[in-house]
Amino acid sequence: MADGKIVQCIGAVVDVEFPRNAMPKIYDALKMAGSELTLEVQQQLGDGIVRTIALGTSDGLRRGMIIQNTGNPITVPVGKATLGRIMDVLGNPIDECGPVSHERTASIHRKAPAYDELSPSQDLLETGIKVIDLVCPFAKGGKVGLFGGAGVGKTVNMMELINNIAKAHSGLSVFAGVGERTREGNDFYHEMADAKVVDLENPENSKVAMVYGQMNEPPGNRLRVALTGLTMAEAFRDEGKDVLFFVDNIYRFTLAGTEVSALLGRMPSAVGYQPTLAEEMGRLQERITSTKTGSITSIQAVYVPADDLTDPSPATTFAHLDSTVVLSRDIASLGIYPAVDPLDSTSRQLDPLVVGQDHYDTARAVQGTLQRYKELRDIIAILGMDELAPEDKLLVARARKMQRFLSQPFHVAEVFTGAPGKYVSLKDTINGFKMIASGELDHLPEQAFYMVGTIEEAIEKAKKLN
């Protein structure tokens, strides 16, 4: 392949000149002679010049430096060799456990599966978290988004889902850390090792592969690391496995695109995002899907800037998801964790034909009661509880019990709360809320329902309070 030379370097964007008859293709990987740095071609400007994004720091680059065209897109190791390992965007190991075997590699850019290869799923994925299982159940092979502003518990919820699903899950998991804190990546690795999901002695017996492009990395790495993780998940799916794919945080993927978009010469669109936002998001999300061979169940954390769900980035993500779990600052401020908003959160699975009539009726009864309580709160704030009709007073009492019963101690938060984590089966969840809605537990104080697992625990707690 022909060599080129750097003609311009602005931050993470580098222009390279090649002979006119040997211009690299879009998405080709370029290597710098005598260095680990990889560049990815984004645009062909004409006259032999291509505009690239550096997947690494561009410090020390200068005009005239020699760049080699590999002739291929970025490829990363896939298959069993990736299990138990921590890799970067290029598939290089960053866990100090030696090189990753390159028996099989795959390009991080590929087309989404054809329509006739797709396999829709109706099976439910039980999470053990009451509020999620009740009002926004997950589908096996579906896509789930955890939406929330800063500090309302996206990562803690994600870790609890990993704890409840990945540890009990017989298949494999891939975790992509996109632009998040390095500390969280480190904690996750050690937690997985303690739970034997990562086998430190025989990594190939592990059940999880980890790919990190943390917030201290250049934008090129953060832009591509989700694709690297997805490529590894697709390889397992194509072998006939059921894969869990966790992404924390999909917003940073968008943000990395925004950072380089202006440098690539594109006009910004709404709120300064890249004009190609919907296309980039679609290209990633359309690949996260289940085929007749195997399934990918994806759980993605989505940061919501300034708690504004109408911001273009979360709004674009909404369109691709089967279930949306919305975390609310108002609920967190009441001390109710997980701070999931049962009125804002939705799921395509919450349909009597999928979950069954009993589950559906219970979920709608809970949502109806909480919605009515929300409407009455203004009256209570102005006139007080005494001005309410007797039936409304009863409804408010039940709604407050439901609200508290939606809280639950988490396994991953045991060290902070001192309370042992609880996993609640779907059957127990439905039974508990049915009893509250029917009025069977009207005689119990509302404190008894706070931070417990099953309804039996709430009844026991009420006895102690008395």
UniProtKB/Swiss-Prot annotation:
Q: Which GO terms describe its cellular component?
A: plasma membrane; proton-transporting ATP synthase complex
Q: Which UniProt keywords apply?
A: ATP synthesis, ATP-binding, Cell inner membrane, Cell membrane, CF(1), Hydrogen ion transport, Ion transport, Membrane, Nucleotide-binding, Translocase, Transport
User: What GO annotations for molecular function exist for this entry?
Assistant: ATP binding; ATP hydrolysis activity; proton-transporting ATP synthase activity, rotational mechanism
Residues noted as binding ATP in the record, renumbered to the chain: 148-155
The protein's matches in SUPFAM superfamilies, at most eight in alphabetical order, are given as: C-terminal domain of alpha and beta subunits of F1 ATP synthase, N-terminal domain of alpha and beta subunits of F1 ATP synthase, P-loop containing nucleoside triphosphate hydrolases
The record describes its membrane topology as: Peripheral membrane protein
The protein's matches in PROSITE patterns, at most eight in alphabetical order, are given as: ATPASE_ALPHA_BETA
Catalyzes what?
ATP + H2O + 4 H(+)(in) = ADP + phosphate + 5 H(+)(out)
Judged by the first EC level, this protein's enzyme class is translocase
Supply the InterPro entries for this chain. Answer: AAA+_ATPase (IPR003593), ATP-synt_VA_C (IPR055190), ATP_synth_F1_bsu (IPR005722), ATPase_a/bsu_AS (IPR020003), ATPase_alpha/beta_chains (IPR050053), ATPase_F1/V1/A1_a/bsu_N (IPR004100), ATPase_F1/V1/A1_a/bsu_N_sf (IPR036121), ATPase_F1/V1/A1_a/bsu_nucl-bd (IPR000194)
Localisation = Cell inner membrane
Q: Which domain of life is it from?
A: Bacteria
Keyword Iron part of the UniProt annotation: no
Q: What is its main location?
A: membrane
Q: What is its EC number?
A: 7.1.2.2
* Family, as annotated: Belongs to the ATPase alpha/beta chains family.
Q: Spell out the HAMAP family in the cross-references.
A: ATP_synth_beta_bact
Quaternary form? Answer: F-type ATPases have 2 components, CF(1) - the catalytic core - and CF(0) - the membrane proton channel. CF(1) has five subunits: alpha(3), beta(3), gamma(1), delta(1), epsilon(1). CF(0) has three main subunits: a(1), b(2) and c(9-12). The alpha and beta chains form an alternating ring which encloses part of the gamma chain. CF(1) is attached to CF(0) by a central stalk formed by the gamma and epsilon chains, while a peripheral stalk is formed by the delta and b chains.
Q: What does this protein do?
A: Produces ATP from ADP in the presence of a proton gradient across the membrane. The catalytic sites are hosted primarily by the beta subunits.
This protein is called ATP synthase subunit beta
Q: Which organism is it from?
A: Herminiimonas arsenicoxydans
